[in-house]
């Protein structure tokens, strides 16, 4: 689990998936009120060879998604991915006290599924 600090404008973190893994990687906001903006998105490419490759884009809901949980191959646990986190606001949207914008490309396998939670 990596817990981000409270979002503030200008904070910027990048995470590289340097090895395929099993288990769970979770990228969490500092609290349930530090959410990912509704424009936050992750593109998950199927890791298979060209010709069988597909991709799916997933967005945070902008209301209560405060975690990215990669706990299955379908959610991007394969080597080569990257996730960027940019602090965009304090005082946020709705009940949020802080907002992160997240984007990235990760690699999964099978029936690709959202890692936002």
Protein language model features and the residues they cover:
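Acidic, glycine/polar-enriched metal-coordinating patches/loops
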Residues: 1-117
């Amino acid at each position: 689990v990596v817990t981000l600090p409270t979002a503030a404008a200008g904070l910027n973190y990048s995470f590289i998936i340097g090895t395929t893994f099993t288990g769970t990687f979770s990228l969490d906001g500092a609290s349930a009120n530090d959410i990912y903006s509704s424009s936050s998105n992750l593109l998950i490419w199927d890791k298979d060879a060209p010709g069988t490759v597909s991709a799916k884009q997933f967005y945070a809901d902008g209301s209560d998604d405060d975690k990215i949980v990669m706990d299955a191959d379908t959610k991007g646990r394969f080597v080569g991915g990257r996730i960027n986190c940019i602090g965009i606001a304090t005082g946020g949207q709705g009940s949020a006290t802080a907002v992160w914008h997240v984007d990235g490309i990760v690699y999964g396998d099978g029936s690709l599924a959202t890692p936002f939670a």
